[in-house]
């Protein structure tokens, strides 16, 4: 007999949420999906990232781009410390800003597959600097991932 897993669906109501985390958890997030584009910058190696039906090892300094409504789980090891930046952008809000069908943000389209991009050291340093600067000006502690 096959067991079917129910995938939780979360709704991101805010236009966007940005958070920096450098911690572990006693109960990692299960595989899930939501209505937001998720951009995840990992500063730690992730041994078993689930994106749709594929599990991959992702090295630190990688950018993981997950279009809305794609099943994912980025880490599942209890009490392991993971350093990361997480940006969730509500897809409805993004389409309002950019214009649906504009082609300006293809990864906001659920038809696209998740992507893993390895950043150059210079690109990684620059992106972290910009994210840190934004977080200093606009702290958003509400994101729990």
Where are the regions that the model predicts?
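Generic protein-terminus/edge-of-domain signal
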Residues: 1-63, 70, 103-104, 114-115
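Short hydrophobic-aromatic micro-motifs
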Residues: 64-66, 87-88
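Hydrophobic, aromatic-enriched interface-forming segments
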Residues: 144-145
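A hydrophobic/aromatic-rich effector-binding and dimerization subdomain
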Residues: 2-17, 71-140
């Amino acid at each position: 007999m096959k067991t079917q897993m129910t995938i939780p669906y979360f709704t991101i109501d805010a236009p966007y949420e940005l958070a920096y985390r450098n911690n572990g958890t006693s109960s990692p997030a299960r595989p899930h999906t939501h209505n937001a584009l998720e951009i995840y910058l990992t500063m730690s190696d992730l041994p078993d990232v689930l994106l749709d039906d594929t599990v991959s090892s992702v090295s630190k300094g990688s950018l993981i781009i997950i279009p809305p409504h794609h099943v994912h789980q980025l880490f599942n090891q209890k009490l392991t410390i993971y350093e990361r930046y997480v940006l969730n952008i509500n897809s409805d809000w993004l389409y309002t800003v950019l214009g649906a069908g504009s082609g300006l943000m293809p990864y906001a389209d659920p038809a696209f597959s998740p992507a893993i991009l390895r950043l150059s050291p210079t690109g990684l340093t620059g992106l972290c600097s910009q994210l840190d600067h934004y977080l200093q000006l606009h702290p958003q502690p509400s994101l729990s991932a």
